[in-house]
Amino acid sequence: MEEKEILWNEAKAFIAACYQELGKEEEVKDRLADIKSEIDLTGSYVHTKEELEHGAKMAWRNSNRCIGRLFWNSLNVIDRRDVRTKEEVRDALFHHIETATNNGKIRPTITIFPPEEKGEKQVEIWNHQLIRYAGYESDGERIGDPASCSLTAACEELGWRGERTDFDLLPLIFRMKGDEQPVWYELPRSLVIEVPITHPDIEAFSDLELKWYGVPIISDMKLEVGGIHYNAAPFNGWYMGTEIGARNLADEKRYDKLKKVASVIGIAADYNTDLWKDQALVELNKAVLHSYKKQGVSIVDHHTAASQFKRFEEQEEEAGRKLTGDWTWLIPPISPAATHIFHRSYDNSIVKPNYFYQDKPYE
């Protein structure tokens, strides 16, 4: 099947579903006729603002790995298909961080840059998340976030220098079409909310000097809507506490802080049968939730998130849509058996529109 035909089939499926949901079925025929002419003439077509907005929302709703999909229809969609210069991209990314952060009352937001043209990226964002900590490794010593080591090395090759602390903010880094090298820009500190991690009952917890940033803005996935590929489309919700407390700060291949947590909460870390890891995880996660709430930054605990996902399941059934999900990602990393998600199965079929992983340009 040739490319135009594949695109036309994707467009037909999307427009039919999108317009049906928007209550505009009577407009489908005319819109598809326009799209067909456009594809025949140019090999592609351009979404209306309404199609783009609803398509991005549908993509969130179809994201099998996301437990937070109840709020799919509240997504704030920023259309920046008009950008042409590095400065415009930089300013749009700064604006995304500011509007999504919303002084701590986090707003689910996506900024959509120009789509690929004939497979060529107009804007290529290198960051995994717009806000993330650098990682350094030398002579067996690890500083910062090991998950960021390869991107940090790429930034250093381009002349960026971090302070080599555990929490250096990586710069924004992206490449424009036609440029051989990407450009980087430091993040203004005033844009980034960071939360020092303290414990509601254990004062010594603050001695660990842990912190995390407020907003997780995924920036290396591709949004696909009706056969059009928006490879640069950073998006965010808010954190579920376990993402920070049971993964980012706890994983052995990340910040690996469980032994230090055990120490400050006063338990021995000698025997697996003492369940010290479990105890340390609970206290660390309690501290994360407490700290974000104390600073007025949106966050959700995994039990509430699972209850919200139950409501999403019910909503989808009422709407007559087939629910899809990836069980291995939907179960929270601590106490999964205490959620309904653990005790049922999900169909992991991929439905479009959706978000897709892309190869990293720096690896």
Curated annotation (Swiss-Prot):
Keywords tagged on the record: Heme, Iron, Metal-binding, Oxidoreductase
> Pfam families recorded for this chain?
NO_synthase
Transmembrane stretches, start-end: none
The note describing how and how many cofactors are bound reads:
Tetrahydrobiopterin (H4B). Can also use tetrahydrofolate (THF) in place of tetrahydrobiopterin (H4B) but binds THF with much lower affinity than H4B.
Question: Some GO term, biological process aspect, for this entry: which one?
Answer: nitric oxide biosynthetic process
Query: Might you give the EC number(s) for this enzyme?
Result: 1.14.14.47
MF terms in GO: heme binding; metal ion binding; nitric-oxide synthase activity
Say what the protein does. Catalyzes the production of nitric oxide.
Q: Which organism is it from?
A: Bacillus subtilis (strain 168)
Source taxon at top rank: Bacteria
Question: What name goes with this protein?
Answer: Nitric oxide synthase oxygenase
Listed PANTHER family = NITRIC OXIDE SYNTHASE (PTHR43410:SF1), NITRIC OXIDE SYNTHASE OXYGENASE (PTHR43410)
Relay the record's extra comment: This protein is similar to the oxygenase domain of eukaryotic nitric oxide synthases but lacks the reductase domain which, in eukaryotes, is responsible for transfer of electrons to the ferric heme during nitric oxide synthesis.
Query: Subunit structure of this entry?
Result: Homodimer.
Family to which this protein belongs: Belongs to the NOS family. Bacterial NOS oxygenase subfamily.
Broadest EC class assigned to this enzyme? oxidoreductase
Gene symbol? nos
Q: Which cofactor does it need?
A: heme; (6R)-L-erythro-5,6,7,8-tetrahydrobiopterin
Reactions the enzyme catalyzes: 3 reduced [flavodoxin] + 2 L-arginine + 4 O2 = 3 oxidized [flavodoxin] + 2 L-citrulline + 2 nitric oxide + 4 H2O + 5 H(+)
Question: Which residues of the sequence carry a binding annotation for heme?
Answer: C66
